[in-house]
Amino acid sequence: MMQDKQGEPNSFRSPDAVNRIDWALKAKNRDLFDYVRGLIALRKAHPAFRIPTAEGLQQGLHFLDTGDSGVIAYTLGEYANGDAWKEILVAYNGNRQQAEFHIPEADWTVVCRDGRIDPGSRDHMPG
């Protein structure tokens, strides 16, 4: 993560000087490190993010029309893969600016926002 390969697009045959892990980048990018660590913990805590079969995904995964090619949003529903959460909405904005789109009606609990993860969040967003 955040590895500097010195511009080498395919470092498979490059020496260790190119492929080594620069641990100083972890400290420099601490916010990103903590965010990814939180995402991993969220994935481990919720079976819905670990659906093992294509059939399971087809049953529970529904993509939303965001009207923006830079925004991906989907729901995982009906306690997917035995999850404790009835329905999960995931939205990722790959744009530099804010995006707006309609989400399904529900009282959503916001667990992840602006690079911060709080599984015990009490922040809500109506759909």
Regions found by a protein language model. Give the residues of each.
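Carbohydrate-interacting/catalytic domains
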Residues: M1-G127
